Amino acid sequence: FKADFTRSLGRFGIIISLAIFILCMALGLITGIQLVTVFIFVGIVAGVVYSLSPFRLRQTIYKPLVNVSVGAVPVLIVASFFNIFSFQLLVLVLLIGLSTAANSLWEDLADYESDFTSKARTLVVVLGFKRGFLITVLVGYCLVPLMVLVGILFQLSLLYFIVLGTLIAFLSFRLIQHRNTLFRS
């Protein structure tokens, strides 16, 4: 239904898309800050190559890489607007971008059946569900040092580290608890 509706928009859909693009670029230009406009443009381009043919990267192995921009670009737009660039901010941008990519892998696990049936070439379909799951878990654990670094760089309270440690312990416990179901051949 949704695809049929989108197709039926035809030229009107293209006009709406161009109007929104022009509005977004105009808002970027109004700020008078070139980097804001550049990051808005990058975000729009990433969205287009993610969704539209001939690229349609959402159905490819590159989907998590494109999703890095989904998390990182909004933070970069705000940072550009306030002209705040620092090592701390870049680490935060990296964490948010990589977290968005990791979330993309989790979504691919949930969509495995439909992606496999529709012959999408996502990372999870290419590697298989079990390997895709293991990669996703590994990526999640690799984000932990970055989360700790962000906590240190931004001088977050002890509560942040307690909550982070509790979440890691809980998720690790659940993985161990269900290892036979999750990791059986």
Locations of the language-model features?
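Multi-pass alpha-helical membrane architecture of UbiA-family
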Residues: F1-S185
